[in-house]
Regions:
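Short, intrinsically disordered C-terminal tails of secreted or membrane-associated proteins
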Residues: 200-203
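ER/secretory pathway lumenal C-terminal domains and tails of membrane proteins involved
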Residues: 1-178, 184, 189-191, 198
């Protein structure tokens, strides 16, 4: 269906204005799930979905946790453990770090490889690199530099093993560090994802 002008989706604490010119059946299904099952059943958007939650107008209600964005029933606000990362949105630092350390167990095996099997599926290890870089920047922004450096090196190790250091710009940037003469805030990383994996419209 054509998206009506100034239309708003409202349900369970969420008020979203879709940016899509047309609402396809799949788009309507997502709204139906939010209306009928959320928040009793959680809703997550995979990183592979790119900017889809933004297209649905849900950007104020999603929080990045590792490789997914979790939908909340209230607007997400920045805080001590929730920081805004340009191009990514608000990131849950502690949950993302726990996932990186204990759930994303593929980091070591990926870093030990010598290239990837084919270009068509190289997005799989790329997801680890992007998630690691995002987490490293988030950790650095709150002064957790040793943890940031560790995650950054792990992400870079995966990119190196996949022979994609230049794709992610690791040959041009250094790990985040504290601002001289300032507080513990770190300079933002300059690493950008490859165009095919850009997750926020207008920034690629």
């Amino acid at each position: 269906i054509q998206t009506p002008a100034n239309s708003v989706f409202q349900a369970n604490g969420i008020q979203a204005s879709p940016r899509l010119p047309q609402l396809m059946a799949a788009d309507q299904l997502v709204y139906f799930m939010i209306r009928d099952a959320f928040p009793g059943r959680p809703v997550y958007f995979s990183r592979t979905a790119g900017g889809y939650p933004y297209e649905l107008g849900l950007e104020r209600y999603v929080l990045t946790q590792g490789m997914a964005k979790k939908l909340l029933d209230h607007e997400v606000v920045a805080g001590r453990d929730t920081v805004m990362i340009p191009g990514e949105g608000l990131v849950d630092i502690n949950r993302s770090k726990a996932l990186w350390d204990s759930v994303f167990t593929g980091t070591k095996s990926l870093a030990a490889r010598n290239g990837w099997v084919d270009d068509a599926s190289v997005g799989i290890p790329d997801l680890y690199v992007i998630s690691g870089v995002t987490l490293a920047e988030a950790l650095a922004s709150v002064g957790r530099l040793p943890e940031s450096d560790s995650v950054f090196k792990q992400a870079r190790g995966i990119a190196t093993a996949m022979r994609r250091e230049k794709v992610f710009g690791f040959d041009r940037v250094q790990p985040p560090s504290a601002q001289p003469g300032g507080d513990t805030a770190a300079a933002p990383l300059l690493v950008q994802p490859p165009p095919a994996l850009c997750w926020q419209p207008g920034l690629c």
